[in-house]
Amino acid sequence: MKLLVVAVGQRMPDWAQTAWDDYAKRFPPELKLELRAVKTEPRGSKSLETLYAAERERIEGAIAKGMRIVVLDERGTALTTKALAARLQAWQGEGDDVALVIGGPDGLDPAFKAAAHERIRLSDLTLPHAMARVLLVEQLYRAWSVNAGHPYHRE
């Protein structure tokens, strides 16, 4: 199974990249994790619709056809660790490759969000982009550890 994280925004602080790399190397070979950063559309005097369209095109270009699309959205479904572990297990059981999408500073195109298979949120708090990436990869690893009976997650 492949987990693809598509994130709008390319430059992350060193600490965020270090944290991402640390968690990414922990995943087992049967659960391939990949990060694809896509360029943020410069705001300038462009309308929000123009920004959304440009970023949506880049996001869709990064996602292989047939992947389950899960967007991170502040209004998405809140999940516990166990619920995320159950989702991960279901995706694996169905043989789905999953693209998890993190929007840019202006969020994601509303039509793209509406067309996604699922919308989840990481927190009720507003998170900086770098923190969202790190939190997502940590929670995905934690979900895997719950399913694998690995001692990383403790109740």
Swiss-Prot record:
Positions contributing to S-adenosyl-L-methionine binding: L72, G103, L122, S123, D124, L125, T126, L127
First and last residue of the signal peptide: none
InterPro entries per record: Alpha/beta_knot_MTases, RlmH-like, tRNA_m1G_MTases_N
CDD domains according to UniProt: RlmH-like
Gene Ontology CC: one annotated term: cytoplasm
Subunit structure, interactors included: Homodimer.
Official protein name in the record: Ribosomal RNA large subunit methyltransferase H
Source taxonomy: Bacteria, Pseudomonadati, Pseudomonadota, Betaproteobacteria, Burkholderiales
